């Protein structure tokens, strides 16, 4: 399954400047998702991080991976209607084993790859990795829960 940004906005509540997934390129319900974000110098975060040496913040990479995980969780809800999904939200529960291996700069394309470690009911545990040009730049274990708004 492929989702463009308009379709992603139908799934996630996030909007500019905090929608951090531009496209989903691969999705296997209940097990795997891959997508990307194009990092642009025109993003507001670069006004302060850092004006003379722009580096995309690691917390934004984590959030982008989490948003991709949210798409995976929502799209894996087979028996839910669009209306039911619209009344749900994904809450972060924990971030473990986070590592930042290389800086991300304007012009990079961040590729998110997430595998499900465990899913029990509304709780999802994900192995999340982010790449630029096939090089691992960040990774973490993410845990989240789908709840009613």
Curated annotation (Swiss-Prot):
Alphabetized Pfam families for the sequence: FabA
Active site per database record: 49
Any GO BP: lipid A biosynthetic process
Superkingdom in the source lineage: Bacteria
SUPFAM superfamilies (alphabetical): Thioesterase/thiol ester dehydrase-isomerase
Keywords linked to the UniProt accession: Cytoplasm, Lipid A biosynthesis, Lipid biosynthesis, Lipid metabolism, Lyase
Predominant place of localization: cytoplasm
Entry-linked CDD domains: FabZ
GO molecular function terms attached to this record: (3R)-hydroxyacyl-[acyl-carrier-protein] dehydratase activity
Entry GO CC: cytoplasm; membrane
Location of the protein in the cell: Cytoplasm
Gene3D superfamilies referenced in this protein's UniProt entry, alphabetically: Hotdog Thioesterase
Catalytic activity: a (3R)-hydroxyacyl-[ACP] = a (2E)-enoyl-[ACP] + H2O
Family, as annotated: Belongs to the thioester dehydratase family. FabZ subfamily.
Function: Involved in unsaturated fatty acids biosynthesis. Catalyzes the dehydration of short chain beta-hydroxyacyl-ACPs and long chain saturated and unsaturated beta-hydroxyacyl-ACPs.
Protein name from the UniProt record: 3-hydroxyacyl-[acyl-carrier-protein] dehydratase FabZ
Species per Swiss-Prot/TrEMBL record: Sulfurovum sp. (strain NBC37-1)
């Amino acid at each position: 399954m492929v989702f463009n940004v308009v379709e992603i906005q139908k799934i996630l509540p996030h909007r500019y400047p905090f929608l951090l997934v531009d496209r989903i390129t691969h999705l296997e319900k209940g097990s795997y998702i891959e997508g990307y974000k194009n990092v642009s110098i025109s993003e507001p975060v670069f006004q302060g991080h850092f004006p003379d040496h722009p580096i995309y913040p690691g917390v934004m990479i984590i959030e982008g991976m989490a948003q991709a995980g949210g798409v995976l969780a929502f799209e894996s809800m087979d028996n839910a209607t669009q209306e039911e999904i619209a009344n749900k939200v994904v809450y972060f529960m924990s971030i473990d084993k986070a590592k930042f291996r290389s800086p991300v700069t304007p012009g990079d394309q961040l590729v998110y790859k997430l595998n499900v470690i465990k899913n029990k009911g509304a709780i999802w545990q994900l192995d999340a990795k982010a790449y630029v040009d096939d090089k691992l730049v960040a990774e973490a274990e993410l845990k989240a829960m789908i709840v009613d708004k």
